């Protein structure tokens, strides 16, 4: 990329939910660049970015991001002129619970995000649910939401930014490894 310092005034980044390694690497790189250049870092929730990018004027929007282990991050939104408003807080949901939630809701809805990874005919064939793009969060989606957050000065302080993992990692250290004493003279 042919950029100069004067070309960069802010960085927007996807702070989750998503896969651990990608989120950590993206956050670390963004932090390093912003800290070294003294520019703001604006986190954007991936579920929000998907909903904002969805094209609907009347359907409820359901955003879905795969977070592994047959679980998804899920959140619902209402379309409003010029954007979307969250209906619910983001949650971790299994495919079985998502099926119940989607099929029992008689409201017309748009399902965006990783619905193509669902191996569930009841969800994808639900008569009140329209499967739509975007299927993945893109840099353009992050930019569109991040720009609004930045322009309205609605983002956290650099030191308060956190990644939204939404669940525990796949790999953890055994508790006994964390409580052993270290002998530096061995």
Give the predicted meaning of each segment.
Residues 1-7:
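Helix-rich "cap/lid" substructures immediately adjacent to catalytic or cofactor-binding pockets
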Residues 7-10, 109, 161:
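Residue-level recognition of the N-termini of beta-strands and the immediately preceding loop/turn
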Residues 10-41:
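DPxDG-like acidic metal-binding loop motif
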Residues 28, 49, 141-145:
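Short amphipathic alpha-helical face segments that pack within enzyme cores
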Residues 31, 35, 56, 148:
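Short, well-ordered alpha-helices that flank and scaffold nucleotide-derived cofactor binding pockets
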Residues 40-137, 165:
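Surface "functional belts" at beta-alpha junctions
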Residues 132-186:
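Acyltransferase
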